[in-house]
A protein has these predicted regions:
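A charged, well-structured terminal subsegment
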Residues: 699-743
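Active-site-adjacent core segments of small-molecule enzymes
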Residues: 1-590, 594-597, 601-602, 606, ...
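Short glycine-rich, flexible loops that bind phosphorylated cofactors or substrates
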Residues: 650-652
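Short amphipathic alpha-helix with an adjacent loop that forms part of the alpha/beta core around
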Residues: 630-638
Length: 743
């Protein structure tokens, strides 16, 4: 065991360095033979057949033919990063786990983020749960916290997991659709599985469309146990709370990103770490003393239920920082193997039936994916703690074990390696008393399937409810079998009647309200109680209808609404990690570009100049302005905000093209911050949003209308600061005319 705490944070990196091969000047084959020619195979004459004794050709092709390994059955699409875990408040009253009690330690970690349903080559921005798996290389062995960005799950018992995944994956007769749940088999299963209703509300919400991995929460999902030095146990749920806040994409935006940049999330993570904008999360725990769990009206062993934070607060005790990208994706991110059974002394399992099944599945799946029981010897998986046991042989064994004995007990080897007492750090399972007959039944305490779905719905803001409704309208409209749609509407009616009716109207199951034209019939105002569904944009009438739509909850400890469940009330004081598109052409006011870039950099954000061509533009004052992207290889959906600096020549050129107009209008439709200074306001005025917002001339002072910031060139510093403040809000859902924008 490494006892040098000062070096502990780098201990895994040092371990990986032992397996890292740096490029050398001379080319060799796998057995060290220096290669004279790597361009041509060995032939009988210049135009003759290739020869069998070309061992280099055979080795090269042979290795290439076997490079691929089976992808993960679920969570195939993923990306990862190295980092460090620091504890700043000891949990010694609750556990003996060193990693959770010693505040002087810096524990190395590897984190893998992933989608669930899609294949390894699918897009990052699919509507899906995100895996949030953390491997902590502790001095007592590896601890894997294999979680998600959603605190609950679809099912209560692991025996249903194969059915869930079979239903969610592409339908077997045609292998369609990829990385999508909007199809018959998924919703058929869900409609027949009421326990999934709480999870469905989360998946249909913006939580399943994170803006960035660094802007989503992580949850251990299950109840675990912490055991202290006196043997007393507490049930615990683990949390990761992002320092950057919780923020999302919108569905139309996510679909477009999937085409423009399917690697959007992994690129964002990689670039943030390379720039030193290290993603951070607070580590928190919810704790319930064993014996007190029965006082709640929900079962702490039920993975479809959360513990309301108003009842059991999250105690923040540590921090996770990701600060280093992998050196090789396959060797690290693809070959890393997580297991829920990787726990350390002081952490144990609960009787959650979903967790119990995962404890088998994760060990079992590594054999088929990595091909050998020796997968723990792979560099990314091996612990920094000493390994000493009697496991031997198997495919691709790395360890050389000298000596005569490979069994215990033994006398020929000094009875080593020997058992370790609890006092010396040996793992001892919690002595839970287990009584009961063998039965295949579900506990009655698992029986409430709608109460916490109502809690989640009640807790959403108006725009968040609108997005849930639109997601269900989209997903169920893709279901071709009518009785499945109808069955789902029955479930939605159990959650909230207005939720059900708005989805039903879009599916043609309820007569839509009669339209009432106003202002030239541009917008329809339906009668009270129903709202006309709109397209991809938020509908003001529907938001107004849904904001007051609430239901009485059950299985929630009496809590009717939880602020912890809504993203709307989270911190909005930072733009760290955000990206801004600066639209420009020759003649741009370069001093305005410089002022914006400097302010954004100071705030931890990035500005990219988007122009008509790569290279550089000539500013109005003759100075060069570097172009980062073009209108052909970028899009507004790849940015968090848009800024248009002034410059008569630049704006004249941009106004003659369609792409800049689309950039602005699409960003407005997606509720993003838009800024313009000087003549840049003229471009906004020429777009659809200019007509809708009444933008006409350059204002004499900085103005803000629904997240659109405008100001004069002489007031650029104030414009930029107002722009940054507006960006920190992430999105401007209050826009009333967004549904009229075509983009």
């Amino acid at each position: 065991m490494n006892s040098d705490k000062a070096d502990n944070a780098n201990s895994k990196e040092q371990d990986l360095n032992r397996a890292t091969s740096q490029p050398q000047p001379e080319l060799t084959d796998n057995l060290g033979h220096r290669i004279n020619s790597d361009q041509n195979s060995l032939r009988a004459g210049a135009r003759g057949p290739s020869l069998l004794d070309d061992f280099h050709l055979r080795e090269k092709i042979h290795h290439f033919d076997h490079e691929r390994i089976p992808e993960r059955v679920v969570h195939a699409r993923g990306t990862g990063a190295h980092g460090v875990f620091e504890l700043y408040e000891s949990l010694a009253d609750y556990t003996i786990a060193n990693v959770l009690t010693d505040t002087s330690l810096k524990t190395p970690v590897f984190v893998r983020f992933s989608t669930v349903a899609g294949s390894r080559g699918s897009a990052d921005t699919a509507r899906d749960v995100r895996g949030f798996a953390v491997k902590l290389y502790t001095q007592e062995g590896n601890w894997d916290l294999v979680g998600n960005n959603i605190p609950v799950f679809f099912i209560q018992d692991a025996i249903k997991f194969p059915d869930l995944i079979h239903a969610a994956k592409p339908e077997p007769h045609k292998e369609i659709p990829q990385a999508a749940t909007a199809h018959d088999t998924f919703w058929d299963f869900i409609s027949l599985t009421p326990e999934s209703m709480h999870m469905i509300m989360w998946v249909m919400s913006d939580r399943s469309l994170p803006r960035s991995f660094s802007m989503m929460e992580g949850f251990g999902v299950h109840s675990f146990r912490l055991i202290n030095a006196q043997g007393k146990a507490h049930f615990v749920k683990f949390h990761w709370k992002p320092a950057a806040g919780i923020h999302s994409l919108v569905w139309d935006e996510a679909q477009k990103i999937a085409g423009k940049d399917p690697d959007f999330h992994r690129r964002d993570l990689w670039e943030a770490i390379e720039k030193g904008n290290y993603p951070e999360w607070d580590f928190g725990v919810q704790l319930i003393a064993e014996g007190e769990e029965t006082k709640f009206d929900f079962d702490v062993l039920d993975a479809t239920k959360l513990w309301p934070e108003e009842l059991i607060p999250v105690r923040r005790v540590g921090k996770l920082t990701l600060n280093r990208n992998p050196d090789n994706y396959f060797a690290e991110t693809e070959q890393v193997a997580f297991m829920t059974t990787n726990v350390v002394p002081g952490i144990d399992f609960s009787d959650d039936p979903l967790l119990q099944g995962r404890n088998f599945s994760y060990l079992d799946t590594q054999l088929s994916r990595l091909g050998s029981p020796n997968w723990p010897e792979l560099p990314i998986n091996r612990p920094i703690a000493t390994v000493s046991n009697n496991q031997r042989e198997g495919h691709m064994r790395h360890t050389i074990n000298p000596g005569q004995v490979s069994y215990y007990p033994n006398s020929l080897g000094g009875n080593q390696p020997g058992e370790v007492s609890a006092q010396a750090g040996g793992y001892v399972s919690y002595p839970e008393q287990v009584i009961g007959p063998k039965v295949r039944v579900r506990s009655e305490s698992f029986g409430d399937h709608y109460g916490q779905a109502k809690l989640f719905w009640n807790s959403m803001s108006g725009p968040e409810k609108e997005h849930i409704v639109k997601a269900l309208q989209f997903e169920l409209s893709k279901v071709e079998t009518r009785h499945i749609r109808q069955h789902m509407l029955e479930h939605l009616g159990q959650i909230n009647d207005k939720l059900m009716s708005q989805v039903a109207i879009a599916l043609g199951e309820i007569t839509p309200p009669a339209p009432k034209p106003t202002n030239g019939a541009i917008k329809q105002t339906p009668p009270s109680g129903k709202a006309m569904p709109d397209g991809t944009a938020d509908a003001a009438d529907e938001k107004a209808l849904l904001v007051s739509a609430v239901s009485s909850t059950t299985a929630s400890g009496g809590i009717q609404m939880s602020s912890a469940l809504s993203m709307a009330g989270g911190p909005k004081d930072s733009i760290k990690g955000r990206k801004v598109a600066v639209l420009a052409a020759d003649g741009v006011a370069s001093e305005q570009v410089d002022a914006l870039k400097q302010a954004l950099m100071a705030a931890g954000a990035t500005a990219e100049v988007v122009g008509t061509h790569l290279g550089s533009l000539t500013g109005a004052n003759g100075s060069p302005v570097t172009v980062d992207k073009t209108f052909a290889n970028s899009s507004s959906v790849l940015y968090d905000a848009i800024f248009v600096p002034g410059g008569v020549q630049s704006i004249t050129a941009l106004m003659k093209q369609g792409d800049p107009h689309e950039f602005v209008d699409e960003a407005f439709k997606h509720a993003k911050t838009i800024g313009a200074s000087g003549e840049g306001v003229d471009l906004l005025a020429a777009c659809q949003i200019g007509q809708l917002l009444g933008l006409k001339t350059i204002p004499t002072q900085t103005q803000a209308v629904e997240g659109v910031l405008t100001g004069s060139a002489t007031d650029i510093q104030k414009v930029v600061q107002s722009f940054i403040k507006a960006m920190a809000q992430h999105r401007h859902w209050e826009r009333a005319v967004v549904e009229q924008v075509s983009a």
